[in-house]
């Protein structure tokens, strides 16, 4: 039986999901889990279809914040569900608010930063804007470019097929179930498709207001980070992405690893997916799930991702992924990329942290500076992590957490990362940093190295030592040499 892991000591039984596969092989596959063949056409086909029901933006008003002009627009991104879906919705017309901040010194033709945000436009008490909006005026003033925030991606709460009103993961999980059960009739039923169209339509609305804007950087958190990925992979106006807490890729391998890490239990964050039987599909697979992943899983877009600059922000105490999840997909990603893991941070990252990460990335990207280059190695014999870089480092810190009882480093577990300085050995302009975990410590250790430069902060992906699951089976963690930067 599968189970949902509620916290460090409590679990509840859930639906049966078969036998998990415990061997985590290097690069891209796990025993019996060959990656799904790519299907890059489904998203593009949906975007083409949805555009027919898109409506132009309407200016709602204009204000000034410390010299920055902020315009508010409303627009309709699409009608969903439509053709290619048997879903029924109580609110098929997707409506949005778009905030656009324009600094006085903005240069014509400069790129636009678009942050995809949430909120609830169908809440019982009326529309509710995102609880923690991005400080777009402050970012626009500091960067000298237009910065926008898209509200209501997805539209919610929604009643799908007469079900009780749902939002966020409840909507995604139900829409996935439909898509998996009828891969052809419901090929456009995944909620991520209209979310992606919402971002694409927002770029159209921005260009209608700023005809000289031709390039975009997209960002968003969690499923909106997923949206940033899919929009960036399918719309060439997007030149860079900054996805936040979107540690999902190589989905079957990644989340089988999550399941085994928690002693063959699912974290409570995945409860909606467990209720809809999707966790069982992760472990056992099915033609319908494979068809879904062909266009949902970004590892299936190697050519498209190579042109995107990627700064991926993750949480060391994430509620969905485990700290070393990234090793299941990072070797499969192409093109320029850097990482930043936030210590002692859950899946729910505040707008101030997001804004600071965006400020650093955009400042460097606008200046034409490549992302810091580094080589990262993990030694599977003793857990040693080694980093070589020529990027000037102002401060280097090791973040180390120990759990004597469980392979669990979620913030909710009570385990905290401790900071300690780490010195590099430098020769001919290249510095090497190393850390080896103490094998005498009981339980498990999670660790990563953070590098703070003059204008940019980046980290290694975390490792966990020792290489075993709670049931004693080995975890030959795929830690091949990673080349970051570019």
Per-region residue spans from a language model:
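Surface beta-strand/loop "capping" patches
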Residues: 360-400, 418-425, 429-430
